[in-house]
């Protein structure tokens, strides 16, 4: 191992990018910096009422440069010379259209303010109808079922649905695009100067989980399948968009001269392959086979790795994909998740905080006091509910405020609140929100357990896991399993740094690198036997309400007029 080697991990989240410098020999986190996306902060290019969420590529470029330069300037001159690799993770599926030169269309002047020419963020649900069409065609029997390895349901959050939707609604983008690229693949290509479609190295993680790529059918779905969806997928775009994929421990190139100068780093820095944030977060958390890693933030992503012999040729139903090498090369990566977790709490906070915002506008002299109350609202609600949970009067809340990802994706579903009375107050209702997110977490655990993929350990990471012990204890009690909290606040970036260390040759493989670099555990929560018993009937009630409510969100049948 190169003595003193340092790698950088870049974690592109929904709101900001984080840069982390890690000492490869010890896993010590040297420096970190977050940089927000300015256009996103201003709410530009997003229409929440329509479930439209877009990121401008310039936001990624500007934020990345600020964050990395800040970290690099904190390193000593020798440490800067010791940087041997950069790893990248991102949200996903977050794809964007590119031209023949590999430019994201929004970086061209004529598309600079066109949301359809930007990255379509993972939680954008404008492509529901297109996703349903893909699922229906997969189940039609006319073609092999390309959805079999992604849980049997194609989601509006994923690659092909978003391509179809944008192509249907925007002729200019459709005509200018020759391919589409995931954010986690684009950033390594940008840094290494390999953005042209023919030079792009597509990551196994994104391709297998979101693009219907699988070695069984030698890559992407056949042209006849895509033509049946819409001929534009093979006529307007290159076919195939790609064929080969790479695991994230393999290098895609080295830092280009331009980016070496912009970041203040040597040109021989290796750029490793990209993957989704939660998959790399699982590696940063030190995940082993049959450990369920819950990356908890605005939503959750639940990751497990399993040996190929146990999975064999089975298809795991209801999840978001099973992909060889998507997490750890040589193991099957399994993905699940909840479409909203922290976002639900944030929605409730905005709802209750509306009068405070209005009062601050009407009384500017008191605006700081009103803002303080608003900022501490969720913390105060959590404390109040924990002091007096009153589980016998817990409202029913279904955690579908942003649809359902797992089990069995359905983005038509909406949040549901029931079983209220005149005695229900704000803390009690917020307690219902906490319980709902824990119940959703349990359905994912049971989805794996019931398909002979036993959950042997549960790890939780992310801001909520580290800062909300009440919420984590409820999850622990509802799932009736020990729940370990990972110490690092930057597990996703840490995982990216681990992959960079392997790509740069510091370690031979990911498990070897994890032994030195992965995060330790902060604590392990144990289920409270009394609360386990009290939550059990409430969980069953949640499942009953799910069965009752889901059919109500099905699309209305088309009416047939009689003349």
Swiss-Prot record:
It catalyses: D-ribulose + ATP = D-ribulose 5-phosphate + ADP + H(+); L-ribulose + ATP = L-ribulose 5-phosphate + ADP + H(+). PANTHER family: FGGY CARBOHYDRATE KINASE DOMAIN-CONTAINING PROTEIN, RIBULOKINASE. It comes from the Bacteria. It comes from Erwinia tasmaniensis (strain DSM 17950 / CFBP 7177 / CIP 109463 / NCPPB 4357 / Et1/99). HAMAP family: Ribulokinase. It holds the Pfam family FGGY_C. This is Ribulokinase. Pathway: Carbohydrate degradation; L-arabinose degradation via L-ribulose; D-xylulose 5-phosphate from L-arabinose (bacterial route): step 2/3. Gene3D superfamilies: 1.20.58.2240, 3.30.420.40. Signal peptide: none annotated. Belongs to the ribulokinase family. It is an enzyme of class 2 (transferase). InterPro entries: ATPase_NBD (IPR043129), FGGY_C (IPR018485), Ribulokinase (IPR005929). GO terms for biological process: L-arabinose catabolic process to xylulose 5-phosphate. Keywords: Arabinose catabolism, ATP-binding, Carbohydrate metabolism, Kinase, Nucleotide-binding, Transferase. One of its GO terms (molecular function) is ribulokinase activity.
